[in-house]
Amino acid sequence: MRKITALFAMLAFAAAPAFAQDAGWETQGLTDDSITIGVMGPFSGNASSYSKAMVGMMAYYQKINDEGGVHGRKLVAVQEDTACDSAKGLAAAKKLISQDQVFMLQGNSCSGVAVALRPVVEESGIPWIVAQAVSDSISAPLARNIFHGVPTGSANGRAMASFVLSKPDTKNVAIIEHSNDWAHSYSDPAKEYLKEQGITPSLELTMERGQTDATAQVLQLREAKPDFIIAALYEAETAIFLKDLKKYGLGEIPVMGTAGTDLENTLKRTGDFDTVKNYFVIHSYVDNLDGPKMEKWADMIKKYYPDEELSTFSFVSIGSAEALVSALEKIGPDLTRSKLIAALEEVRDFDTGILSDPITWTPEDHQGVKGSAVAGFVDEKPTVLKAWGQPY
């Protein structure tokens, strides 16, 4: 009987997560005057523009530090470059967890990298707030230590389809997308929403990454005559697609893009307002980038990073950093990793003042932001919209 009991005890110990084995784990990366936070992002490579999200988040850390920190502790960012590459991302995560022994992780661009990191981070048990990457697979199925602080692909995909159908008399919807998981994370929930409303896409087209001509796809669209097009494409391919739409006389058809594109950047890429005048994008914020509600955040980033050129990506991770600080403040000075996880699960309807939708995390659901606004050009000015013709 003793042998059986001992065997069960050994099995239970082996099956328990690493963070339950060692009390010292609870305060690893924590001192009396600092909280170390591992910040991973593509600080180099072709996707380095996404790292602006990490810069905005770290500017917020510095703001909090200048105000005295959280219960006397400064937020200390330990940066690691993923270059938007899964292998480099895995190496970065392992270094931060095992070598640097940070208290928690926050950040991460590039969904493919973040999905690859999930098993390592989940096994480690350390808190991880995903602050830019959108793939649902990062935070679902539920992992107790992983939290999404931005709208996921499914939230954005449904928001895209909802906006499309808010345009009166929209019945014929076409979709063009990349063939990767990132694109599907938008298009699949968009199609689910359309189906719920009794609409099946009239056309589903693929445009691969790196493709420099969309003539074949545009000619098919000309035959289908859609009322609206959903485009799950990266910025470079979006610009090519919009140019070819105009070239073949389809420039009046509105196009709904993802959070992976930026309205102003798309205008810069095309170099022609007529090409983008009917282009709309998911917009996670309460105002235009140069609007009064965003001014204090822009000033904050410029204070700490005066040479930083601001874009849509610059602001996306700040909201989840605010939610983190709020949770840390509520815990008090006696901080542990388990207490932080529990406090994050108590965040309800947290108004960040920057994201268009609040953050709510519960023990059953760690995908905290359930909706998004849309941005488009109205009277040739970028405008945040709740629905077709309805400013935010």
How would you describe each model-predicted region?
Residues 1-36, 66, 391-392:
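Short, low-complexity disordered leader/linker segments with a strong preference
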Residues 245-318, 382-392:
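Extracellular/periplasmic periplasmic-binding protein-like sensory domains
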Residues 24-58, 80-87, 109-110, 176-184, ...:
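Extracytoplasmic "Venus flytrap"
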Residues 33-36, 72-76, 99-104, 123-127, ...:
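Loop/turn elements at helix/coil->beta-strand transitions in domains of secreted/extracellular proteins
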Residues 303-314, 325-384:
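Segments of small-molecule ligand-sensing domains
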Residues 96-108, 129-131, 173-177, 225-235, ...:
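Periplasmic-binding protein-like
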Residues 22-25, 49-55, 67-140, 207-214, ...:
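Beta-alpha junction/loop-to-helix N-cap segments that form part of ligand/metal-binding clefts
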Residues 91, 136-137, 144-249, 288-296:
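Extracellular/periplasmic Venus flytrap/periplasmic-binding protein
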